[in-house]
Amino acid sequence: MDGATVDTQTRPVNVILLGPPGAGKGTQALRVVDTHGMVQLSTGDMLRAAKDSGTEMGNRVAEVMARGDLVTDEIVIWLIEEKRTGGDAAGFIFDGFPRTLAQADALGALLEKTGHRLDAVIALEVDDEILVNRIVGRAEEARAAGQPVRADDNAESLKLRLTEYYKKTAPLLGYFHAKGVLQSIDAMGELDAIAETLSAMVKDAAI
């Protein structure tokens, strides 16, 4: 958002965005970055950057991805730790990680090791029917604009991704609720209203 005022935190915060595919995590994470000056840690972006870096770790990532295998939690945690090493006054927002209970435990251990804590986990809640409509609509808009369409932007792929989400990632809601850090947002409304609510939650987490 050009010309936006950055609302820096009173202290660095670590925030996780949770939600099913198509909930708008990436979009809202970028808004938090613009508003609060935080750093977005997107595992997808980090893996792609590592793959293209030519480093030893990058070559490992490239080999795993070329085989079509899942990148190990060890590699993902290493990438996150490396990204966090530079530090940032306003903190970090995790987008797309953790996705499993094991990853949540690993992230908690990393934060504790570096003298930090998890301040808030914010779940974006969207009905499955709305998610399907969003994904199908996104694909139709891309086609109309002559842009490439993501291979998984269709109803069938989304249903498979949702099944995986509810099996592996949804249990994190109970996990973080038990730790007292879980909050939720109705993410079926206007983007600006969602962003405003999310921004207030992030600001409160820094108190």
What are these regions (language model features)?
Residues M1-I207:
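Glycine-rich phosphate-binding loop of ATP-dependent small-molecule kinases
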